[in-house]
């Protein structure tokens, strides 16, 4: 067992970005950053890392074929060692969360449970798996806001809702892209049940919901600059979802770049919220 393997199995880039996102959530809720708020980044990074490790534990047989270089199939970390490591990361994140607020602690515990349930059962469950991923993405902003109390959490509801709905749209379109591979792997996704076309319609409806959520005046950032900036973001999100709306085949969805456009729209929304919060 090497130190580098224990770092690599956490997907550190993913964990660090999640941690920084929590800080941005606090910034949006309060308009500033404080030294204690750095705890948020550490907590989210640890819990995200734990989720990534438990995912590798559950996917070990698939990784033996598709990703034999991953730490567990490569023999760099044992299954027992990975399970213990994941538990330590979750416990560490929750323990640090006790130093924050009751709201933050509750979200940390709930998200840890969802990450485990997702890896064990929801990952290959149609729609519910997509909803779990979307909730986890949006809840990071609620977690950041919750460090400022219930008022901070409420201020971040719009961004959390945008992220939740846009992520569902993107996850569904990603599933539509991967129908052939998922079928070969024995997965069961929404596009495999209702077809690519109906999945695109549902994804577009979720994108419209994200646009509606962006207009909700929950924070002090709501004003002329925000409305001008979010209008552009909304167009990007709608354009991305619309690109996938007319598709009837996985190849069409891939060629539409709908998922990439939606991801760009989500990052742009985050930038608009952050800038509006500090000006």
Curated annotation (Swiss-Prot):
Top enzyme class: transferase
Membrane topology classification: Multi-pass membrane protein
GO MF term set: geranylgeranylglycerol-phosphate geranylgeranyltransferase activity; magnesium ion binding
Pathways involved: Membrane lipid metabolism; glycerophospholipid metabolism
GO process annotations (BP): glycerophospholipid biosynthetic process
Catalyzed chemical reaction(s): sn-3-O-(geranylgeranyl)glycerol 1-phosphate + (2E,6E,10E)-geranylgeranyl diphosphate = 2,3-bis-O-(geranylgeranyl)-sn-glycerol 1-phosphate + diphosphate
Swiss-Prot/TrEMBL cofactor(s): Mg(2+)
Record family assignment: Belongs to the UbiA prenyltransferase family. DGGGP synthase subfamily.
PANTHER family the UniProt entry points to: CHLOROPHYLL SYNTHASE, CHLOROPHYLL SYNTHASE, CHLOROPLASTIC
Name of the protein this chain belongs to: Digeranylgeranylglyceryl phosphate synthase
Organism: Methanoculleus marisnigri (strain ATCC 35101 / DSM 1498 / JR1)
